[in-house]
Amino acid sequence: DLPFSVKLPNALDPHLRIRDYGVGMTEDVVYDVYINYMKSDKTDTNSETGCFGIGSKTPLAYADQFNITTYNDGTMTMYALVKSEDGVPELNEFGSWDTQEDNGVEISFSVKEDDFNKFSNRAVEVYKYFNTRPEVSGNGDFAYPERKDIISGDTWRISKGSYSDNTVVVMGNVAYPVDVWQFEYDSKERGFLHNNAVIEVPIGDLNVAPSREALEYNEHTLKGISKAIDRVMAEIADSIGVRFAKANSWWQAKAIQREIVREIKGIGSIEELSMFNGRSLDDYPELY
């Protein structure tokens, strides 16, 4: 996928600019999407993030207006969506010009100087979970944190952390911390969720609040989280079996067992997975 670009606000240009390189938006689509609340072009699909019909207007939560620039087959058109005195959005079209830019859309708005660092820090937190990260400019200090994975699969990973760390699920590139208190104290879910883990799930497997800031913890979401954890735990069990198979002695197998217990939380009975030469490690002397 061709990454979209993000220009962070700075002293030379205080605008946040987000530019994609998709199919662009025709005039009819612009008016349809930006004037109608609860209007979405993603209502009937789980292949893209969206469907509530309010995401396109979210810049108005910060600014009184924002700019929309569309690029369609050699034509650039500029619009501004303005919040009127009564709170109703008004779309103003400035005009169209010839361009050699690739098709796509750019959204931009002015950011207060005191908020420059907040936008940069938030960009790190949001984009670090993206499968295809954007090309970020405007801040020479922008960098993603180094990640030290303990164990991982194609759609999940567990990194070094503390007991206070909790699991995050990622759906449609959006990360949602999972509330451990939604599960019973002695449940397998709650035990696992204390890992510093990231699990990707398909769009539609969980329900989210309209704000997209949190999960909606109904029966569908709880079952979806439980299903995702079961999948990860099964893969971890397979991986642990491979690690024990590499042990050259029961002493080394015991050391592997302790390392696993220290690194990974809530994976069930580690004793059931701890084997050496086909025998449970419980049959061997304790390692001191």
Annotate the PLM regions.
Residues 21-22, 109-115, 207, 214:
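A generic structural motif
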Residues 1-44:
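Conserved beta-strand-loop-beta-strand hairpin that lines the nucleotide-binding pocket
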Residues 91-94, 117-234, 255-288:
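GHKL/Histidine-kinase-like ATPase module
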Residues 246-257:
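Intrinsically disordered, low-complexity terminal/linker regions enriched in Pro/Ser/Gly
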Residues 12, 24-31, 52-53, 57, ...:
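Conserved structured core elements
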Residues 230-244:
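Flexible helix-coil linker/hinge segments at domain or subdomain boundaries
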Residues 45-154:
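GHKL-type ATPase core
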